[in-house]
Amino acid sequence: MMKFIALFALVAVASAGKMTFKDCGHGEVTELDITGCSGDTCVIHRGEKMTLEAKFAANQDTAKVTIKVLAKVAGTTIQVPGLETDGCKFIKCPVKKGEALDFIYSGTIPAITPKVKADVTAELIGDHGVMACGTVHGQVE
């Protein structure tokens, strides 16, 4: 029993500060960091600034990149409105296949955003389909 507790504590410490995410593409996303988030659920606060940083390898040559953010709430998936969709404002375009990219997106969570729990999926879409995709469990407070 003590060995299990020690192993659990070691895993918890090793995971501290790391955001748990699911790569919903083909393994392009190597790292995801959201300001103030760690563990299995990312809690963001209305009216506060947040920064998302994703490191990924481009899986295609593309002249443009489009950002698409989806939220799954109570079994229904909706596209999140009001967010910037031009990915070239956050990474240098054109993009070359195999290029290591660091995507940084900053913004303020609108104060009128309802308190909700959702699975949030962000996709970066190039000329030939999805370039990178990640899903996190999120909660707005």
UniProtKB/Swiss-Prot annotation:
UniProt GO BP: sterol transport
Localization: Secreted
One GO CC term, this protein: extracellular region
CDD domains noted in UniProt: Der-p2_like (cd00918)
Coiled coil: none
Repeat positions for Sequence: 64-65, 68-69, 72-73
Disulfide bond sites: C24-C133, C37-C42, C88-C93
InterPro entries: Ig_E-set, ML_dom, NPC2-like
Region (3 X 2 AA repeats of K-V): 64-73
Major subcellular site: secreted
Any Pfam family hit: E1_DerP2_DerF2
Gene3D superfamilies the UniProt entry points to: 2.60.40.770
Effect of E53D: In Lep d 2.0201 and Lep d 2.0203
A GO MF label: sterol binding
Consequence of changing I125V: In Lep d 2.0201 and Lep d 2.0203
Effect annotated for changing I91L: In Lep d 2.0201 and Lep d 2.0203
UniProt entry keywords in alphabetical sequence: Allergen, Disulfide bond, Repeat, Secreted, Signal
Effect of V116I: In Lep d 2.0201 and Lep d 2.0203
Protein family per UniProt: Belongs to the NPC2 family.
Record note on quaternary structure: Monomer.
PANTHER family: NIEMANN PICK TYPE C2 PROTEIN NPC2-RELATED, NPC INTRACELLULAR CHOLESTEROL TRANSPORTER 2
Designated name of the protein: Mite group 2 allergen Lep d 2
Organism: Lepidoglyphus destructor (Storage mite)
Lineage: Eukaryota, Metazoa, Ecdysozoa, Arthropoda, Chelicerata
